[in-house]
Amino acid sequence: MGKDKNPRRVAENEAMAKTRMLRTSPQKLNLVAQMIRGKKVDKALADLTFSHKRIAVDVKKCLQSAIANAENNHGLDVDELIVAEAWVGKNLTMKRGRPRARGRFGKIIKPFAEITIKVRQVEEQA
């Protein structure tokens, strides 16, 4: 009469990874996420490796974690994986200030974001 096991959040041919507290705005992070959506994982890793965006390094680490989860936890074939979904969300926002002229105070917003990457195994057509 114990508690039921939690249902699996992803399908049998999927795996996912999430990275939180990335020090960038969600808008900038989404530019990198759009770059890899729907691509094969080896092509996505190559694109992230040679991207000039600073946040691409962190997105690459998250994608490598999703690939490792697929291989080790779910037994999926790495050569048949694609980036099924990559979505970005807001996280907390640090609020800082800067003294300005005439006794005023300028507000500085330092946003954080999070990314979730889901990879899916697809069978190649012959």
Curated annotation (Swiss-Prot):
GO terms for biological process: translation. PANTHER family: CHLOROPLAST 50S RIBOSOMAL PROTEIN L22-RELATED, LARGE RIBOSOMAL SUBUNIT PROTEIN UL22M. Part of the 50S ribosomal subunit. Keywords: Ribonucleoprotein, Ribosomal protein, RNA-binding, rRNA-binding. Signal peptide: none annotated. The keyword rRNA-binding applies. Transmembrane segments: none annotated. Belongs to the universal ribosomal protein uL22 family. NCBIfam families: rplV_bact. This protein binds specifically to 23S rRNA; its binding is stimulated by other ribosomal proteins, e.g. L4, L17, and L20. It is important during the early stages of 50S assembly. It makes multiple contacts with different domains of the 23S rRNA in the assembled 50S subunit and ribosome. The globular domain of the protein is located near the polypeptide exit tunnel on the outside of the subunit, while an extended beta-hairpin is found that lines the wall of the exit tunnel in the center of the 70S ribosome. It holds the Pfam family Ribosomal_L22. One of its GO terms (molecular function) is rRNA binding. This is Large ribosomal subunit protein uL22. GO terms for cellular component: cytosolic large ribosomal subunit.
